Amino acid sequence: MAYCTYCSAEKLHSEKELPAIDLYKSKRISDVYNSAKRDGQQFLILSGKYGIVDANQPIAYYDHLLTAEEVEEHTELVAEQLSAIRISEVVFFMSSLKHDALVKPYLDSISRACEKLEVSLVCKEGDYQD
């Protein structure tokens, strides 16, 4: 099982690659990361650019919001990545679509990738401010 949440627009501007957990400036990401550590679960971030990213994976700064038009291609990338790490269940932490409609492409991508791989997906909505 892995806890997963989507990336954030707020990032630390850096010329060098940083571990994903340090790049994203998001209370939601930090909270889910800490919950995963507390519960002994793997933690993943769903990036609009990189797909599935481990918390400690170094990535470069980017500014990209996943769009509906990109979901099909993004889904293929995410499915390949999930398959490679052999995840059987994903718990996806997200804001409600009513609160943040920009989450929908991320939800669509992770949902389709999990469906393709027959991986269980549990979505947990929270009152996140980012």
What residue ranges belong to the model's regions?
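Peripheral peptide segments
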Residues: M1-D130
